[in-house]
Amino acid sequence: VEHRKFLCPAPGYDRHFAITEHFGFELIPIAMHDDGPDMDAVEAYAADPTVKGIWCVPKYQNPTGIIFSDAVIRRFAALRPAAEDFRIFWDNAYCIHDFDADTPKIPDLLALCEAAGNPDLVYEFCSTSKISFPGAGISAVAASPANLIDIKGFLKFATIGPDKLNQLRHARFFKNSAGLAAQMQKHAALLCPKFEAVYGALHEELDGTGV
């Protein structure tokens, strides 16, 4: 397809934009609101068959920290793109990166897409890179059975197989979702005081300056 386009909520993650630009897509910026991307614009652009997908970080979106609302996520699930191969690239990198228990939980887009008759609309992925080892964690992808067949078809040429020892290390260390949650609380205990110190210094030095 000539003149392929990809939707890029902006501001957003530069690596996402670089990937699609490298593969020859025209990048279309989508404005971000307090509850997520401008869905009127997303729906309008999705009516163009040359638009092939959209990048999304639904929780703590780079760099603003926005969390997509339930309403926005449900509109994503209900999309009827003109291109049959349109895909939502749902980068749920920060799905468990919460400092406290009051953080809103976002709906399961994959389940919503299936319920809406759009099972193949989304690729959801994440990793432990910001939980265990930056650049050396393990990754995960969730998608429909048909999409997983496609993904495996590409991966078998990209790699012989995953680092199974690294997978074993992670499985033995974290054990389950409770283990992951406990690790994130340890991160929070280290990071929260640092953020509070920075915020305090900024307020002390800059309040009233008009900056």
List the model feature ranges, each with a label.
Residues 113-192, 204-205:
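Conserved core segment of the aminotransferase class I/II
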Residues 17, 192-195, 199, 203:
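Structural signal for well-ordered, non-membrane alpha-helices
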Residues 91-92:
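Walker B catalytic acidic pair
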Residues 1-84, 95-116:
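Conserved core of the PLP fold type I
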Residues 209-211:
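Conserved PLP-binding catalytic core of the aspartate aminotransferase-like
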